């Protein structure tokens, strides 16, 4: 299965009639493995900040998480495993695997829990597969 198929079929799939706004799978170095067409264009330093927060949980809390110039308030995640952010009626979930970052961005009517489920389920699967 291609990385793009994981984004199209597993991240951008329908869940309770809702879809993620955008999604991507990136390498820890910020290289794009696959992304939805409307995934925000990000800066390398934004990905570096995300990776640093996985290594040093709490790093992003004072400044917020930035992706594509959008600022998300960091909310409770799982230190070193999952970062969650909130902005208005939407937010972001990022799951770290051994080799990749799985990112899902949502807005209402999708709920944070639905986004977490989709992103973390794929991340757990990829971890089980050695990624």
Curated annotation (Swiss-Prot):
This is Profilin-2. It comes from the Eukaryota. It is found in: Cytoplasm, Cytoskeleton. The gene is PRO2. Occurs in many kinds of cells as a complex with monomeric actin in a 1:1 ratio. It holds the Pfam family Profilin. Keywords: Actin-binding, Cytoplasm, Cytoskeleton. Its main location: cytoplasm.
